[in-house]
Curated annotation (Swiss-Prot):
Binds 1 Fe cation per subunit. Belongs to the LuxS family. Disulfide bonds: none annotated. Involved in the synthesis of autoinducer 2 (AI-2) which is secreted by bacteria and is used to communicate both the cell density and the metabolic potential of the environment. The regulation of gene expression in response to changes in cell density is called quorum sensing. Catalyzes the transformation of S-ribosylhomocysteine (RHC) to homocysteine (HC) and 4,5-dihydroxy-2,3-pentadione (DPD). This is S-ribosylhomocysteine lyase. Its EC number is 4.4.1.21. It catalyses: S-(5-deoxy-D-ribos-5-yl)-L-homocysteine = (S)-4,5-dihydroxypentane-2,3-dione + L-homocysteine. Homodimer. Keywords: Autoinducer synthesis, Iron, Lyase, Metal-binding, Quorum sensing. Its cofactor is Fe cation.
Length: 152
């Protein structure tokens, strides 16, 4: 059976919120990194789908304004955070700083991008109010640079 990195992570010992380099892949000169942007404590809480979906849209646009080389930002199936796939090498500090900036933008935003039936496959399932509330929760707790101990 194939090994899946996220299934090997001990979800009982991590301490969210945090940013974690979850994997790298090298092919010739091309380097791809996968980051775990964990917002909520696994097996304790989960983002409601409206908040998760809205945060996905806001992160998709605003993180690309902060960082170069983003390939994709996708919600985790467990609804506790997001995976971000990027070209080239970055530091967790760089990712955290960008995420803090973006979550502050989320708190102050009034418009969710790409919420029409043409642009979004589930355009009715959004909650800007909830996205803002969860952004505040994450910022209030602080985003750690380590998944197992709080390094703020």
């Amino acid at each position: 059976m194939a090994r899946v990195e996220s299934f090997e992570l001990d979800h009982n010992t991590v301490k969210a919120p945090y940013v974690r380099l979850a994997g790298t892949e090298q092919n010739g000169d091309a380097l791809v990194e996968k980051y775990d942007l964990r917002f909520l404590q696994p097996n304790k809480d989960a983002l409601p789908t409206g908040a998760l979906h809205t945060l996905e849209h806001l992160l998709a646009v605003n993180m690309r304004d902060e960082l170069k080389g983003i390939i994709d930002i996708s919600p985790m199936g467990c609804r506790t955070g997001f995976y971000m796939i990027m070209w080239d090498q970055h530091s967790p500090q760089e990712i955290r700083d960008a995420l803090v900036n973006v979550l502050n933008k989320v708190i102050n935003t009034e418009v969710v991008p790409a919420v029409s039936a043409k642009e979004c496959g589930n355009y009715k399932d959004h909650s800007l109010f909830a996205a803002k509330e969860y952004a505040k929760i994450v910022l209030d707790q602080g985003i750690s640079l380590d998944p197992f101990e709080r390094i703020l």
